[in-house]
């Protein structure tokens, strides 16, 4: 059960399931299914499987089920990795982070159901789950020895790119928080047309300010990732890890901007909204990988 040959497919399975956890959370919020099980947790409306199953209840139940399965699969992956490749420096910290943040994510979700948390607190839920996803994603990359294939294990990232990338991580995380806040405060259609309502630019209420803040952070994110991408391609053109990684990040942020704009234009089409959540999930995963590479560079300097 915990054999080394299970690591690759377990890593892929865990990454896929964690992706569905992210999408499930976005689906719950976008469809207003947060109260699909009332204030009961882990039960649903006081029962394991309630007799009355409207679509909101089905969505909330499905999200809880996928989250429970993800915890089992991630635990399986963590135990197997710890046992067989625990000698790799990053495996144990990533294992602790992935399980720890998955549990915190579940507790925040439960608290939201039972006590109806403030939306500014609920917005942290998505960011917490992204950290858990990224830890699983990184373990999977390590398991597949992606570092050796793309010479990342001998990559040295110089200080300018490290600074740009750390700032990129902070900016993206703040943008993720404002995006989650848009969902939880139901501000998706606030502040008028995209990119800005030129005939009425000044926000008028809290919903407008939340949406305005997210659009502003999204613009800063796009510009900063573009600057970082240009620097990386210009100075590391001979390294495939940097070239492919930062190119993928730039493509993902472009897709993120497009789906964000389309969400407003289409009055929050559900499919577009889910793609919006998907692209930011994998963008954050890529940034987490860059951080891993930078930490290795820092260690090599000591």
From Swiss-Prot:
Residues at the catalytic site: 60
Name any Gene Ontology BP term: heme A biosynthetic process
Any one GO molecular function term: metal ion binding
Q: Which residues lie on this side of the membrane: Cytoplasmic?
A: 1-8, 89-93, 147-161, 237-244, 292-302
Where, by residue number, does heme b bind? Answer: 214, 276
Q: Which domain of life is it from?
A: Bacteria
Q: Which one Pfam family would you cite for this protein? A: COX15-CtaA
Which keywords belong to this entry?
Answer: Cell membrane, Disulfide bond, Heme biosynthesis, Iron, Membrane, Metal-binding, Oxidoreductase, Transmembrane, Transmembrane helix
Topological category with respect to the lipid bilayer: Multi-pass membrane protein
Task: Report the protein's function.
Answer: Catalyzes the conversion of heme O to heme A by two successive hydroxylations of the methyl group at C8. The first hydroxylation forms heme I, the second hydroxylation results in an unstable dihydroxymethyl group, which spontaneously dehydrates, resulting in the formyl group of heme A.
| Family of the protein in this entry | Belongs to the COX15/CtaA family. Type 1 subfamily.
Q: What is this protein called?
A: Heme A synthase
